[in-house]
Amino acid sequence: MLVEAALETLPREMWSLPSIQRYVRKKRKNPNHVLLDRSFHHGGMLQLKDAERRGRPDLVHFSLLEANDTPLFFTAKLQIYVHTYNDFVIAFDKNIRLPKSYHRFAGLIEQAFEESTRQDLISGVNSSRLIQIRSQTFEELVMQTSPSVVIGLTTHGKLISGSQLSQEVISSQKPMIAVGGFPKGHFTSRISNYLTSERSIHPSSLGAHVVTARTIYDIEKALR
């Protein structure tokens, strides 16, 4: 799962900015249903707390595509969650096929946030309950899902090979793997306090989509 992901709707403190008002008028949407995106809102983000960790839904999209297009997901051996910076959890149905286009993905997530305010779910052509969004902390998600281990992948963790990590994962009854869904920094205490262990698969910092792809591939190899 991606944790503290840089995926959120426009924070309330930005709504009154002229540039934001123009942007949401152009999109004809409520600001609470528009994704914060540094590509469009850089100037307005300068005064935000933790601005360097926020407003990168494209990074989340890349990582989700790496997970969604895998045999591990196709065979229902992988459950995808995204925990966001502002404590929402997005759960993806096993039948979902995420769009390759970022703009289509952003529109889908914006629609999901809009529907979640009415406690509804998005329905697809061939599936229902494809995306579910709820207000939930990482701690609450761990309590709800009751994983046997929670492994955080971070450069602060013990350096091990991909094959060693995959063996740790497949030897656990119900493992959860946490990957940082932000462009800079490390897990905050609201994540690290609930990790069973911290591991690193490379001496250098890697993008979330690279970590996701390599980890899933190593697990698939170990399961053969």
What residue spans do the PLM features occupy?
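Structural signal for hydrophobic/aromatic residues that build the beta-strand cores
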Residues: 64, 153, 177-178, 198
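Structured adenosyl-cofactor binding patch, chiefly the S-adenosyl-L-methionine
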Residues: 183-224
